[in-house]
């Protein structure tokens, strides 16, 4: 693979990952206590979890076309984040006894359902209303596509060296995981805590986050290229 193509693929994948993280609804510790909307965990942890699942499904398509690998990555990430949000909602509704609503919008932007009168006083919402669920699925898809693209590019580059198919796939997966974490953490710092999805005011920070991930991914791509073609492997 051409070194510039490898850097470009890693950069594009990193930007997709960083952008996708901004769509994922994360409420942190307050959400774990049903006092904020979103999944009760950290941004980087949830995004990385979905990304790792996407990388597993992408790796399962090794040897297929790049589009198939990226599609598999998207499906894996979407399933992981979707199941996580679904189970979370089941716990919020039937365990805690709260209605999935957001305190940051008067009505759900997608369904038009009123939110304010269902928000428990003293909280910022709870559960995952429709807009958060859809936003999370979009974020998972973007992250999965980005991770799949990075994996494919690294695997193609490593296959031309002394590695066998299994060795190339393993090293490519390790590299992809590292690059995924880099961009997930950068996006998490840009968000600065919790976010509900594309309807959250913090979502406006996505432009700055994409620029940061672009720069970091170019550096990561250049270092990866030096390692791959510089005689390390």
Swiss-Prot record:
Pfam family of the protein (one): MtrD
GO annotations of cellular component type: cytoplasm; plasma membrane; vesicle membrane
Membrane topology, as annotated: Multi-pass membrane protein
Swiss-Prot/TrEMBL catalytic activity: 5-methyl-5,6,7,8-tetrahydromethanopterin + coenzyme M + 2 Na(+)(in) = 5,6,7,8-tetrahydromethanopterin + methyl-coenzyme M + 2 Na(+)(out)
Main location: membrane
GO BP term, example: methanogenesis, from carbon dioxide
Sequence intervals crossing the membrane: 4-24, 39-59, 67-87, 133-153, 166-186, 209-229
Coiled coil: none
MF GO annotations: tetrahydromethanopterin S-methyltransferase activity
Record EC number: 7.2.1.4
InterPro entries in the record: MeTrfase_D
Assembly: The complex is composed of 8 subunits; MtrA, MtrB, MtrC, MtrD, MtrE, MtrF, MtrG and MtrH.
NCBIfam families: mtrD
Protein family per UniProt: Belongs to the MtrD family.
HAMAP family: MtrD (MF_01097)
UniProt-recorded name of the protein: Tetrahydromethanopterin S-methyltransferase subunit D
